[in-house]
Curated annotation (Swiss-Prot):
<protein>
    <recommendedName>
        <fullName>Large ribosomal subunit protein bL28</fullName>
    </recommendedName>
</protein>
<keyword id="KW-0687">Ribonucleoprotein</keyword>
<dbReference type="GO" id="GO:0006412">
    <property type="term" value="P:translation"/>
</dbReference>
<dbReference type="Pfam" id="PF00830">
    <property type="entry name" value="Ribosomal_L28"/>
</dbReference>
<comment type="similarity">
    <text>Belongs to the bacterial ribosomal protein bL28 family.</text>
</comment>
<dbReference type="GO" id="GO:0003735">
    <property type="term" value="F:structural constituent of ribosome"/>
</dbReference>
<dbReference type="InterPro" id="IPR037147">
    <property type="entry name" value="Ribosomal_bL28_sf"/>
</dbReference>
<dbReference type="InterPro" id="IPR001383">
    <property type="entry name" value="Ribosomal_bL28_bact-type"/>
</dbReference>
<dbReference type="InterPro" id="IPR026569">
    <property type="entry name" value="Ribosomal_bL28"/>
</dbReference>
<dbReference type="GO" id="GO:1990904">
    <property type="term" value="C:ribonucleoprotein complex"/>
</dbReference>
<keyword id="KW-0689">Ribosomal protein</keyword>
<dbReference type="InterPro" id="IPR034704">
    <property type="entry name" value="Ribosomal_bL28/bL31-like_sf"/>
</dbReference>
<dbReference type="InterPro" id="IPR050096">
    <property type="entry name" value="Bacterial_rp_bL28"/>
</dbReference>
<dbReference type="GO" id="GO:0005840">
    <property type="term" value="C:ribosome"/>
</dbReference>
């Protein structure tokens, strides 16, 4: 599985970096993902979770 939030599905988004001459280069905006242990089906598992999901209390650490 890729680097994506286990709870919200947030992942990196793409776009362009623009110089002063308006040249376009591809770039990525990475989500703030943290690897944490949570209970999945009653068992502890290490998954990627976004910091926003952790702060809002959507998951609890084990």
């Amino acid at each position: 599985m890729g680097k994506q939030c286990f709870v919200t599905g947030r992942k990196a988004s793409t776009g362009n970096h623009r110089s002063h001459a308006l040249n376009a280069n591809k770039r990525r905006w990475n989500a703030n993902l943290q690897k944490v242990r949570i209970l999945v089906d009653g068992k502890p598992k290490k998954v990627w979770v976004s910091a926003r999901a952790l702060k809002s209390g959507k998951v609890t650490r084990v």
